[in-house]
Amino acid sequence: MVPVLKKYKAAAVNAEPGWFDLQESVRRTIHWIDEAGKAGCKLIAFPELWIPGYPYWAWKVNYQESLPLLKKYRENSLPSDSDEMRRIREAAKANKIWVSLGYSELDLASLYTTQIMISPAGDVINHRRKIKATHVERLVFGDGTGDTTESVMDTEIGRIGHLNCWENMNPFLKAYAASLGEQVHIAAWPLYPGKETLKYPDPYTNVAEANADLVTPAYAIETGSFTLAPWQTITAEGIKLNTPPGKELEDPNIYNGNGRIFGPDGQNLVPHPDKDFQGLLFVDIDLDEIHLTKSLADFGGHYMRPDLIRLLVDTNRKDLVVHEDRVNGGVAYTRTIDRVGLSAPLDASATEAQSESV
């Protein structure tokens, strides 16, 4: 698809989520969508696990301390086929805006680190899950499967992609995105401590500065794409909500001020936000600015040697239980996006919801 709109305004969220509170999380999501719409944006990008906030407490507590927090976190995670999701999709439609949303997806009895792309019509055109939860995140989240791997999609505002956290550092996922001609990327980040918290032998890659100012611009350079990096922030009240009784309360400022937006050549395009900034970072995107960057190094095209190096990608769903297709033979698969109820157009979803309420 040739982009219909090559020049437009986009926004990256740099704000605090509604910790452990699904309804407050949805309220804040709609608020920022509305704000981006009022500002004339065609795209808004939310951080990783924006709903109901990143479980950063998992890095701070032992097993027993984690249990009350984990229970509350699960109770406030977002089912994809829900009234809350419909309200978010309706907000996207009302503002005629593309929305990249990161959330803790409750699917049956498991949680997944999920991103969706909502179109200006309120339809979900991409549903993906983080392919591998990072370190202690594996105590909370499962892994994505083949058909939740796709990250890049053709839209009227260009080939847009999104990945979660350290997926933006994964060379294989970057190579796959480059092969699809990605033009605008959303590097969605969670809540991250600053370098002042670093203690040997914890690697420098595990602090905010490394990911905001090294990993993210590297993604922009290697893929030749505009790269928006939305980040979560936290206040003193948020620290209290994420800290078990008896634990010392941290200074929230060590976690804040990390939102970034980079051009396709890796240049920083917006001032770094202040530690107390809660809001949107804006950028004017011009897809034609990508031409010269990719003319020098297009790793998905002229600057690669597929006769020497190739990447095998399996986008087939892997099910615990499969059913025989007795009509056509073989095995019948249901796409994840269909099974979780996100593939139906918004208008159809609304009609179905009204029928159920009668």
Curated annotation (Swiss-Prot):
Record-linked SUPFAM superfamilies: Carbon-nitrogen hydrolase
Catalytic activity as recorded in UniProt: formamide = hydrogen cyanide + H2O
A Gene Ontology annotation in the biological process aspect, one of them, is: cyanide catabolic process
Cited PROSITE patterns: CN_HYDROLASE, NITRIL_CHT_1
Alphabetically list the UniProt keywords. Answer: Hydrolase, Lyase
Q: Among its keywords, does the record have Lyase? A: yes
Induction of expression = By cyanide.
User: Where, by residue number, is the active site?
Assistant: 48, 130, 165
One MF annotation (Gene Ontology) recorded for this entry? nitrilase activity
Q: Of which family is this protein a member?
A: Belongs to the carbon-nitrogen hydrolase superfamily. Nitrilase family.
Q: What does this protein do?
A: Catalyzes the hydration of cyanide to formamide. Degradation of cyanide may be important for plant pathogenic fungi in infection of cyanogenic plants.
Q: How does it assemble?
A: Oligomer of dimers, forming left-handed helical fibers.
Entry protein name: Cyanide hydratase
Q: Which organism is it from?
A: Penicillium rubens (strain ATCC 28089 / DSM 1075 / NRRL 1951 / Wisconsin 54-1255)
